[in-house]
């Protein structure tokens, strides 16, 4: 297991994937666990890593980030930048815009995985991940 220590709270999958490619000299199976909500593209690095190794992407997300709950005013904080703000989750427009954004991000992410030929799985926190992993490995075995 590689122990990649980020220098800041900002997510930089690109650097972490490059680290994997440079450090692991022999072919390995590498699991990348992340929410994959990043600002920089990592498609090229992922493609290179998957040519050298067997890369499996595991997206872990909180269901509340997918389906914004209707709870009125909510204070949110960007974990990477520290920026805080209030949003009105009772706004149908806001929840719809958030849902559209989520779906767009998932489409882009699935496109990256597909073009990089990387097997992937999405798991919500609190969800039974064992069954999803069994299905993934069953598909990989065929």
Residue ranges, per PLM feature:
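Acidic beta-strand-to-loop metal/phosphate-binding motif
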Residues: 29-35
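Von Willebrand factor type A / integrin I
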Residues: 22-26, 38, 44-142
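Von Willebrand factor
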Residues: 1-28, 40-42, 60-62
